[in-house]
Amino acid sequence: MKQNKYDDSVFFSEYENMPRSTKGLNGAGEWPVLKALLPEFKNKSVLDLGCGFGWHCRYAREQQACSVIGVDISEKMLQKAHEMTSDPSISYINMPIEDINFPDSQFDIIISSLAFHYIKSFEAICKKTYRFLKPGGSLVFSVEHPIFTSRNEQDWYYDSQGNRLHWPVDNYQTEGVRNTTFLTENVIKYHRTFSTYINDLIHAGFKINAVKEPMATEEMVKNVPEMKDENRRPMFLIILAEK
């Protein structure tokens, strides 16, 4: 199923007001960890899968990438990306990630931010990205952590006073569809285990260079005290793999 909630006007309006939409990369809590894993962009060709507003595309060009292609299923997302981009070396393609097709060995770097957990077959994406990368090329991506996606509810257990007791994990080994809620809308995500992420990459031919589970920094907790609970369970998984 190729899901496109972002072209729904109400859903998009809510997404547009999220911190990661209004503040860009600095509004994404996992960005410092993802940024630290990114390879050298200078004179590199880059593909961004699930590019959204194009923040990572523009960052790659700021770091002197020679060309960048952003792919997204949402027309509204790409309309916003075009409005924010005035660089002929960045191009955007309106297409589901599942349907991408590029020549072998076209890209030096492929990046994806919080998109692959909306894709049914991670195995297929691994095979495609491996083929699209040049030898020595890098795949860097973030997804919602399997501990976060295991249950449909994707929420804490609370006591009668509304205090967060713990983050429940259930049906972890049962991969597949999770009917969950995001921005008050019903959204389909695909849960897979930590080992599936790793093994699908290895089976496609990738070498795993780094695996990160970002934590809320002291500064984040100081500015937003509720963020301390984010360190009670991982929300994101970030992986750097090399062809």
Predicted regions and their residues:
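A short glycine-rich, Lys/Arg-flanked "PGG" loop and its adjoining helix->strand segment in the class I
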Residues: 123-138
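A short acidic, Gly/Pro-enriched loop at the edge of an enzyme's catalytic core
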Residues: 98-110
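A short SAM/SAH-binding and catalytic strip from SAM-dependent methyltransferases
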Residues: 108-123
